[in-house]
UniProtKB/Swiss-Prot annotation:
This is Trypsin inhibitor 6. Disulfide bonds join 4-21, 11-23, 17-29. It holds the Pfam family Squash. The presence of a 'disulfide through disulfide knot' structurally defines this protein as a knottin. It is found in: Secreted. The keyword Cell wall biogenesis/degradation does not apply. Belongs to the protease inhibitor I7 (squash-type serine protease inhibitor) family. The record marks 6-7 as: Reactive bond. Strongly inhibits trypsin, weakly inhibits chymotrypsin. One of its GO terms (cellular component) is extracellular region. It comes from Cyclanthera pedata.
Length: 30
């Protein structure tokens, strides 16, 4: 499993997100 803090963060690309979160299609990290 990826390490991804459960924090709602808007993003445009994966590098906008914390830890191993990825930028999902709805525009938020997950």
């Amino acid at each position: 499993a990826r390490i991804c803090p459960r924090i709602l963060m808007k993003c445009k690309k994966d590098s906008d997100c914390l830890a191993e979160c990825i930028c999902e299609e709805h525009g938020f990290c997950g």
